[in-house]
């Protein structure tokens, strides 16, 4: 048994979609979330920058004595996870591997589309991971640099619909039956995305698989918290705490949440 918290990081707030699934799956576990809003989006940054920024968030979580770390960010998973996993003793769980597994299991036509940040798409991480599981699957990747900032800004519905429709234009004539939401911000735009691609497409949100895999790892390594241990969820941002708190309360459906500002590199 291990009462230490689960650590979750993201470049911004998208990782809250992963955190929410983790809390639902494991209600007895405490968690610590850090969103690096001061430096988001990661998708347009260089490999070196992404690794450095992700390392800062990892070190922050290590300072909080977490027992496992979830990269609730596809870009960090695709670009930085392999490097940082070699540097720390704790296991890191990433969203790309979980999403790829779900996509390979879901597609019936063996045609999968992936939307993600520029960095995630450029890494071809989903293509590699999906085809590792089934080499016959055709994977089409589409960079969507506007969608993560759009989800963070949370504008009015007309603006969201217009930006999503324009961004997803390349998918309208693409051949696929399964769409992977290759950025943890995208589930926050799920309704707008479905309105463009159609109800007939199967949508893969890696967050569900991440929560299940984390559960499996904790069970395997006997790291579950004791059932009598107090449960606490802490939220940190490198951005502005007040706005972070407002949005986090809305997305997590919890008006008691208080977000805290932190300089992750300190």
UniProtKB/Swiss-Prot annotation:
Pfam families: Asp_Glu_race. It catalyses: L-glutamate = D-glutamate. PANTHER family: GLUTAMATE RACEMASE (PTHR21198:SF2). Its EC number is 5.1.1.3. One of its GO terms (biological process) is regulation of cell shape. The keyword Nucleotide-binding does not apply. Keywords: Cell shape, Cell wall biogenesis/degradation, Isomerase, Peptidoglycan synthesis. The keyword Isomerase applies. The active site is at residues 73, 183. This is Glutamate racemase. InterPro entries: Asp/Glu/hydantoin_racemase, Asp/Glu_race, Asp/Glu_racemase_AS_2, Glu_race. Belongs to the aspartate/glutamate racemases family. GO terms for molecular function: glutamate racemase activity. Substrate binds at residues 10-11, 42-43, 74-75, 184-185. Pathway: Cell wall biogenesis; peptidoglycan biosynthesis. Provides the (R)-glutamate required for cell wall biosynthesis. SUPFAM superfamilies: Aspartate/glutamate racemase.
């Amino acid at each position: 048994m291990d009462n230490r918290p689960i650590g979750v990081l993201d470049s911004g707030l998208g990782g809250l979609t992963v955190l929410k699934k983790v809390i639902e799956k494991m209600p007895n576990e405490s968690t610590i979330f850090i969103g690096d809003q001061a430096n988001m989006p990661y998708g347009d940054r260089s490999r070196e920058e992404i690794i450095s920024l992700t390392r800062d968030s990892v070190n922050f979580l290590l300072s909080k004595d977490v027992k496992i770390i979830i990269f609730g960010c596809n870009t960090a998973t695709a670009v930085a996870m392999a490097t940082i996993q070699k540097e720390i003793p704790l296991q890191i769980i990433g969203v790309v591997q979980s999403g790829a597994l779900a996509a390979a299991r879901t597609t019936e036509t063996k045609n999968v589309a992936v939307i993600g940040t520029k960095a995630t798409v450029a890494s071809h991480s989903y293509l590699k991971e999906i085809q590792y599981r089934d080499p016959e699957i055709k994977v089409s990747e589409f960079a969507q640099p506007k969608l993560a900032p759009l989800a963070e800004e949370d504008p009015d519905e007309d603006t969201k619909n217009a930006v999503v429709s324009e961004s997803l234009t390349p998918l309208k004539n693409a051949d696929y039956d399964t769409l992977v939401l290759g950025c943890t911000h995208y589930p926050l735009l799920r309704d707008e995305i479905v309105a463009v691609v159609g109800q007939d497409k199967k949508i893969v949100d890696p967050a569900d698989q991440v929560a299940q895999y984390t559960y499996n790892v904790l069970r395997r390594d006997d790291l579950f918290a004791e059932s009598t241990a107090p449960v606490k969820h802490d939220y940190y941002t490198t951005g502005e705490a007040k706005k972070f708190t407002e949005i986090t309360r809305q997305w997590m459906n919890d008006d008691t949440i208080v977000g805290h500002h932190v300089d992750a590199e300190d």
